[in-house]
Structures are given as structure tokens and as C-alpha cells.
Amino acid sequence: MTVEERSNTAKVDILGVDFDNTTMLQMVENIKTFFANQSTNNLFIVTANPEIVNYATTHQAYLELINQASYIVADGTGVVKASHRLKQPLAHRIPGIELMDECLKIAHVNHQKVFLLGATNEVVEAAQYALQQRYPNISFAHHHGYIDLEDETVVKRIKLFKPDYIFVGMGFPKQEEWIMTHENQFESTVMMGVGGSLEVFAGAKKRAPYIFRKLNIEWIYRALMDWKRIGRLKSIPIFMYKIAKAKRKIKKAK
């Protein structure tokens, strides 16, 4: 099948990425409605943070790819703040890991199937075990994320499983590229890139304490806990510069 067409929710353009101006509650209802309608298409959800937006501004193919998603939601306070600076305020930040957990709650109630694709074999196994304890009504299957985009062996395995959800934790851009490369081989499936969420569910990484999340500085905690992320922090000032430049351009156009 194919990806559900872009939703009819209001859109907010952040440096060319078309975000849906929605809330977590609305997204949960959208996912429930998708299954209730028994669509044979797939629901492709992108959770984009400033780093993803930055990457998209310099990689046209990736920008075009994610703009084909059914929904693009703001996973990052930086995106929400940018929308306010551009006078197109997004309603809420929707963290990818929390949206994934909401999907799992729906899957648990409906006795659905979930495929976890990503991370190392050890980590994804641990994530599946932990999630199975939390959501016993879900049928899980998994595979590690160290595969080529064109690897059809894994795709065949997933097709045989017939999942209702495929959560891809390979990091961007690979996870979104994998989804769009293979989505036409599935039907009636929610597909979402979830970055490092599998590591968090596995217990390999800790999510930021509540106070960091409340203050919208979860990214600082992640950088402090994982030195490999330090180099990625440079994307924040670059993103801020691009937003400031876009704001000046809007002012000049008036």
C-alpha cells in the first residue's frame, strides 16, 4: 500500500519542514481513528527536532521525504520556540518516546502486534522484554538495526509477522529512509522513527529526570550523560541562526 496523505490539520512551516499544529491528545485520537477506519494505507509519523530540521535544510531529498509523512510533529522545545519566533506558534511539543508509549497503550488495549527495528541485538531484545512486561497483551517481534536499506530479508520477516506498528530506531536519516523505502510492502501499519527510544526502554540509557523535561532542557541532560552527543550540540546555534535569518526575511517581505 502507500502512506496516508498529509493530514488536514493546520501546518506550520519551519525552514521548509511542514509541521502539523497538533497535540498529543489529538495524535492519540488520530491513531485510534486510523485503525477504526481500517485503512489499507500506512500512517507514517515523523517526530522532528531541531537537529532533523537542520539536516533537512541541507539535504533536499530528505526534506522531500519527510514532508511526505502523514504527520510531522515537534519533538523538541527548540522547534516550538522557533515557531513562536516566526509568528506561527505550534500548540505543543510532542516527544517521540511519549508518542511511542501512547501507541503501545493503544496496542495493548487492542491486542495488536508491534515490531521493534533498531539498536543492537542485545538492546532491542532487552527493550522487547521490558515492554512485554509492561504491555502483556501486545505481540512483539524485533530485529537489530544494523542492516542495509535494501535488505529484503528483514522486510520479509516483518511482513510475515503482519505488525500493526513498526518502530524504527536507527537514528535519522536512516530510519525515515528505511520507512519510505519499504512502506509500500506493508498495509494498515503505523510506522514511526523513534531514534534512541529503544535504548531508553531497554534501560541502556536513562531518560532525563522530570525537572529537565519540565524546563524543556532534556537535550542538555542527554548531552551531559552521553559525551558522543556533545558534537551534535552545535546544531542548536546553527538552527537558531537559521530561524533568526528566516525571521528577518519575513520582516523584509512585509
Swiss-Prot record:
Keyword rRNA-binding carried by entry: no
InterPro entries given in the database record: TAB_Glycosyltransferase, TagA_TarA, WecG_TagA_CpsF
Enzyme Commission code(s) on record: 2.4.1.187
Pathway this chain belongs to: Cell wall biogenesis; poly(ribitol phosphate) teichoic acid biosynthesis
Enzyme type, top EC level: transferase
Keywords carried by this UniProt record: Cell wall biogenesis/degradation, Glycosyltransferase, Teichoic acid biosynthesis, Transferase
GO molecular function: N-acetylglucosaminyldiphosphoundecaprenol N-acetyl-beta-D-mannosaminyltransferase activity
Catalytic activity: UDP-N-acetyl-alpha-D-mannosamine + N-acetyl-alpha-D-glucosaminyl-di-trans,octa-cis-undecaprenyl diphosphate = N-acetyl-beta-D-mannosaminyl-(1->4)-N-acetyl-alpha-D-glucosaminyl di-trans,octa-cis-undecaprenyl diphosphate + UDP + H(+)
Pfam families, per database record: Glyco_tran_WecG
A GO biological-process term: teichoic acid biosynthetic process
Protein family (similarity comment): Belongs to the glycosyltransferase 26 family. TagA/TarA subfamily.
Role noted for this protein: Catalyzes the conversion of GlcNAc-PP-undecaprenol into ManNAc-GlcNAc-PP-undecaprenol, the first committed lipid intermediate in the de novo synthesis of teichoic acid.
Name listed for the protein in its UniProt record: N-acetylglucosaminyldiphosphoundecaprenol N-acetyl-beta-D-mannosaminyltransferase
